[in-house]
Amino acid sequence: MPVHEIRHPLIRHKLGLMRRADISTKNFRELAQEVGALLTYEATKDLPLEQYEIPGWAGPVTVEKISGKKITVVPILRAGIGMLDGVLSLIPGAKVSAVGVARNEETLEARTYLEKLAPDIAERRSLIIDPMLATGGSMVATIDLLKKAGSKEIRAMVLVAAPEGIEAVRKAHPDVIIYTASIDEKLDENGYIIPGLGDAGDKIFGTKQKEA
């Protein structure tokens, strides 16, 4: 399973700002969107193109457009919503397929409570977005759901990933490609990524924060 850690200077700079314990909700939210957009650039750089002709100012001109399967963006609720605008700024025509997954804070097991998928998801590339890949439970549950719905080409895009989460996805779904801004050190005893970003959902939505 390919894992791409995108170490672009702009991404490294913005991710460093996001790691601050005292970051404001406004700044965290804006940076999540910006890093999401930058990761989207990398995650879509191998999309196929086809040529076509248009009328130009000096006569007909041959240009290119994306061909093949269209894309559906799959935010894992709730934190994935924080990356959505950044992703859609680059692929505004993509359909959005929302998946709600809750993690039991004691067992760390994932439970799916919502799925609103694009009706033609089997004919689309699925791009899952979530700020954190920690234990991997939510990601694996989402991929399970998408494959059951007929999705065959799936990629995952996260801001930070723990080695444990990457390994969980690799074991369950070795065909899924992961793009991340950082592979962090480890998980702590509570399942939080170290050094991580803290609770990304709380920081995006302005609710109670937990530092990790």
Swiss-Prot record:
Uracil binds at residues 193, 198-200. Signal peptide: none annotated. Pathway: Pyrimidine metabolism; UMP biosynthesis via salvage pathway; UMP from uracil: step 1/1. The keyword Transmembrane does not apply. Allosterically activated by GTP. GO terms for molecular function: GTP binding; magnesium ion binding; uracil phosphoribosyltransferase activity. It catalyses: UMP + diphosphate = 5-phospho-alpha-D-ribose 1-diphosphate + uracil. Coiled coil: none annotated. Binds 1 Mg(2+) ion per subunit. The magnesium is bound as Mg-PRPP. GO terms for cellular component: cytoplasm; cytosol. One of its GO terms (biological process) is uracil salvage. It is an enzyme of class 2 (transferase). Transmembrane segments: none annotated. Keywords: Allosteric enzyme, Glycosyltransferase, GTP-binding, Magnesium, Nucleotide-binding, Transferase. InterPro entries: PRibTrfase_dom, PRTase-like, Upp_B, UPRTase/APRTase, Ura_phspho_trans. The keyword Magnesium applies. Its EC number is 2.4.2.9. 5-phospho-alpha-D-ribose 1-diphosphate binds at residues 78, 103, 130-138, 199. Its cofactor is Mg(2+). Belongs to the UPRTase family. Catalyzes the conversion of uracil and 5-phospho-alpha-D-ribose 1-diphosphate (PRPP) to UMP and diphosphate. This is Uracil phosphoribosyltransferase. It comes from Pseudomonas aeruginosa (strain ATCC 15692 / DSM 22644 / CIP 104116 / JCM 14847 / LMG 12228 / 1C / PRS 101 / PAO1). The lineage of its organism: Bacteria, Pseudomonadati, Pseudomonadota, Gammaproteobacteria, Pseudomonadales.
